[in-house]
Structure formats: structure tokens, C-alpha cells
Swiss-Prot record:
Identification of the protein by name: UPF0145 protein CYB_1351
Family: Belongs to the UPF0145 family.
Organism in which the protein naturally occurs: Synechococcus sp. (strain JA-2-3B'a(2-13))
InterPro entries (alphabetical): UPF0145_dom_sf (IPR035439), UPF0145_YbjQ-like (IPR002765)
One Pfam family per UniProt: YbjQ_1
Gene3D superfamilies for the chain: Hypothetical protein apc22750. Chain B
Domain of life assignment: Bacteria
Coiled-coil blocks: none
Length: 103
């Protein structure tokens, strides 16, 4: 499965557009992780605990996006975008793209 942020692929032809696919991953926040992140913000520097959560969430959301596209018979997803959102109780990562059948 080919995933790309572009909407045109050099050297590949789109045989059929199969529709928009979306995926979402939600993680609950963690009191200890939040406390450690707050300390890090006061001291300064990167908050590795949250970076790891976002890294994992992005991997998971792309895996889910790929699975949903495969169910449509796609072998590629064009125009992939990933968005993150954080509230006091959760972290939301969404992905969207256009499922396609490539030649």
C-alpha cells in the first residue's frame, strides 16, 4: 500500500478513485505523564513522554487508514493528512486521504 501526501504520483497512473478514507485514534491522558510534562515545561526542554504518545498515535492512525482503504480494494492513498488535537482528558489523532486503485 502506497501512502503519500501528494495528490499526483510521478510514474504511476490512477486507475480508479475509490473515495475518501478517514481514521481516528484517541488516547486518554495520564495523570503521572501530565505531571512529568508540566515539570519538564517549567524546567525547559522537550517532553519525550508526550512525543512518544504522538508518535505511536500517528503510526496507529496510518495503520487504520490503510486497513480502511484496503477494504475498498485500494492499493494507494493520495493526499494523506494527519491532524492532532489535545484536550485536558484526551489526545485525538485523525488521518484522511483519497483511496485509489493504482495501475
Amino acid at each position: 500500500m502506497l501512502l503519500t501526501t501528494t495528490d499526483v504520483l510521478q510514474g504511476r497512473e490512477v486507475e480508479r478513485y475509490l473515495g475518501i478514507v478517514t481514521a481516528e485514534v484517541v488516547y486518554g491522558t495520564n495523570v503521572l505523564r501530565d505531571f512529568l510534562a508540566t515539570l519538564r515545561n517549567i524546567i525547559g526542554g522537550r517532553t519525550r513522554t508526550y512525543e512518544e504518545v504522538f508518535e505511536n498515535a500517528q503510526k496507529k492512525v496510518l495503520e487504520e487508514l490503510e486497513q480502511r482503504a484496503k477494504r475498498l480494494g485500494a492499493n494507494g492513498i493520495l493526499g494523506v493528512s494527519i491532524h492532532t488535537n489535545m484536550s485536558t482528558t484526551m489526545i485525538l489523532v485523525t488521518a484522511a486521504g483519497t483511496a485509489v486503485k493504482l495501475r
